[in-house]
From Swiss-Prot:
Signal peptide bounds: none
Oxidoreductase keyword on record: yes
InterPro entries reported for this sequence: Cyt_P450, Cyt_P450_E_grp-I, Cyt_P450_sf, Cytochrome_P450_monoxygenase
Pfam families listed in its UniProt record: p450
UniProt keyword Transmembrane helix present: yes
GO CC list: membrane
Protein name stated in the entry: Cytochrome P450 monooxygenase sphH
Residues reported to bind heme: 487
Induction statement: Expression is positively regulated by the sphingofungins biosynthesis cluster-specific transcription factor sphG.
GO molecular function, one term: heme binding
Species of the source: Aspergillus fumigatus (strain CBS 144.89 / FGSC A1163 / CEA10) (Neosartorya fumigata)
UniProt topology in membrane: Multi-pass membrane protein
Location (main, coarse): membrane
Length: 543
């Protein structure tokens, strides 16, 4: 926390030692009372230092511009929560002159930097990718749910995991999975139709998109990740699906406040040990998922040992054949694929449906392209699909890219400097936390033009724009990050979204149940509509 705070701690430690060895020095003759007073003094000193002294007099980052009007408790955000202030960050980036780095304070006057230029992004994500890591509190929080897979691993361990998993996510492998994505998309649309047909009132056609998106993406991860159909679409009460419902439930206000306390203390492991209802649900869900993945690994190994069995193309089989992962690490990778993979794609599909409800002209145009180029899926013999067919639809890919740009499922990530370093020549002390925000960068007019904050798939149409959106830099599109810590599954995720969205938009016309209601979001490791997307689905016949 700084020399003043450290000095006070040393003094308190010295007093405590004196009292321990010389009881006659204790307050009121009680060691317990003395230690209680000392601990209270340390806590108060840390709080005063954090709230008042450090940001005003001590911070070594004063040379970076910051917003005015910092509050002693809520910093520059005006919020008692740790949610990233995306709207404020966008305004700061526009109005505060900076050369790529801004400084601000969140609740408790905890200091953060955020990045606004491609040059700084390139430095932190590529050239110095392993000089910055996820903060310990974030690692602890995510590891509990996702295991110590590629998303959490750091340093040499991450390099090892990425090198050995990369072949499983290469396009030459993912293209063979398009048929899996498409089959689940068609299964989902048929089940939605069946659901609508079973309802008594003809105007009862509201669909909760979240549940269908989550179950379809979970089934896809099962098939593509480990060659196993979880059957979540067919069975809403599927144990694996229910486990994730437990884990990803929106945390209550009390949990958020305790998390802030954990951040101030620099450690959140104790939060998981509190006897709260949410912890019990998360522990049960995680235990169920870990037990299930352990069984899957065991069964998959037995299948691979059979000399007569056909070679599997799922991701975990590719990882097994490399021979570089033991069972525990394979379980961690499966936990990561299942949790992070299905949650982000489910969120992306929800955002896609929401965007198409808000832009019916885009929805109609996309439906025309899909129905004109893809085989019907509601006849007796639905036609097959392959990667080349899906990839050849320019407007489908433009819409998917714009959804991912405009509504990044992971709106921000945080990195902490592991050692004293520099960014663009500016000194960055060890422990400095840097917020990298796709939500900010993906909407910057300086990179995307004056319509940066408008949903516009046409920006991805035309010569040379299919992969860039016409942006001024490839670092303008930050949804999958860049460099060695970029999302290893981005090709997989984009293909999955394209197949699911094509199946839905080709089969239904949809509009929001309450089009004028304000959008509320649920923000955690990912961001999605708070209560899901409630949309009225109307089957469109003839396809």
């Amino acid at each position: 926390m700084g020399p003043i705070h450290n000095y006070f701690g040393v003094v308190c430690l010295g007093i405590a030692a004196s009292v321990y060895f010389r009881p006659e020095c204790a307050l009121y003759g009680s060691r317990i009372a003395t230690f209680a007073v000392l601990l209270t003094g340390i806590a108060i000193s840390k709080l005063l230092y954090q709230l008042f002294i450090y940001p005003q007099f001590v911070t070594p980052l004063k040379h970076f511009p910051a917003p005015p009007n910092r509050h002693w408790l809520t910093g520059n955000t005006g919020s008692l929560l740790v949610d990233t202030p995306h709207a404020l960050m966008k305004e700061w980036a526009k109005t505060i002159p900076n050369d790529g780095i801004l400084r601000y304070y969140i609740v408790g006057n905890m200091e953060r930097l955020t990045v606004t230029s491609p040059a700084v992004l390139r430095e932190i994500l590529v050239s110095k990718a392993y000089e910055f890591a996820k903060p310990l509190v974030i690692q602890q929080t995510l590891r509990r749910v996702l295991g110590n897979g590629i998303l959490i691993a750091e340093g040499e361990e991450h390099k090892f995991q990425r090198k050995n998993l990369k072949p499983a996510f290469a396009y030459r492998h993912v293209k063979d999975l398009y048929s899996v994505f498409w089959s689940k998309g068609t299964e989902m649309t048929k089940l939605i139709r069946k659901d609508l047909q079973s309802r008594k009132a003809p105007d009862d056609n509201t669909i909760q998109v979240r549940t269908w998106a989550s179950r379809s993406s979970l089934d896809i991860i099962g098939l593509a990740g480990m060659g196993r159909d979880f059957g979540s679409l067919q069975d809403p009460e599927n144990s694996l699906s229910q486990s994730y419902e437990m884990i990803f439930a929106t945390p209550g206000l009390g949990t958020k406040i305790l998390f802030i306390l954990g951040m101030l203390l620099g450690n959140t492991t104790w939060l998981a040990k509190l006897p709260t209802k949410q912890n019990r649900l998360i522990d049960t869900g995680c235990r169920n998922i870990r037990d299930a993945t352990r069984r899957m690994i065991r069964e998959q190994k037995a299948k691979m040992e059979d000399p007569n069995a056909a070679a599997e193309v799922d991701i975990i089989s590719v990882a097994m054949r490399s021979g570089n992962f033991d069972d525990d690490n394979l379980i961690d990778q499966l936990m990561t694929f299942l949790g992070a993979g299905h949650e982000t794609t489910a969120g992306a599909l929800q955002w896609a449906i929401y965007a198409l409800c808000k832009h019916p002209d885009v929805q109609s145009r996309l439906r025309e392209e899909v129905r004109a180029n893809l085989p019907p899926i509601h006849g007796e013999n639905p036609g097959p699909i392959d990667a080349a067919t899906i990839d050849s639809l320019p407007y489908l890919n433009a819409v998917c890219n714009e959804v991912i740009r405009f509504h990044p499922s992971v709106p921000n990530t945080v990195r902490v400097a592991l050692n004293d370093t520099t960014l663009m020549g500016h000194p960055i002390p060890k422990g400095t936390q840097v917020v990298i925000s796709p939500e900010l960068v993906n909407h910057m007019p300086a990179l995307w033009g004056p319509d940066a904050e408008r949903f516009n798939p046409d920006r991805w149409m035309g010569p040379g724009k299919a992969n860039t959106g016409g942006a001024a830099s490839n670092y303008a599109f930050l949804s999958f990050l860049h460099g060695p810590r970029s999302c290893i599954g981005q090709v997989f995720a984009k293909a999955e979204l394209a197949c699911l969205l094509a199946a839905v938009v080709g089969s239904f016309a949809f509009e929001l149940k309450s089009p004028d209601a304000p959008l509320e979001v649920r923000e955690g490791a990912t961001i999605a509509p708070k209560d899901g997307v409630l949309a009225k689905f109307t089957p469109v016949e003839g396809w």
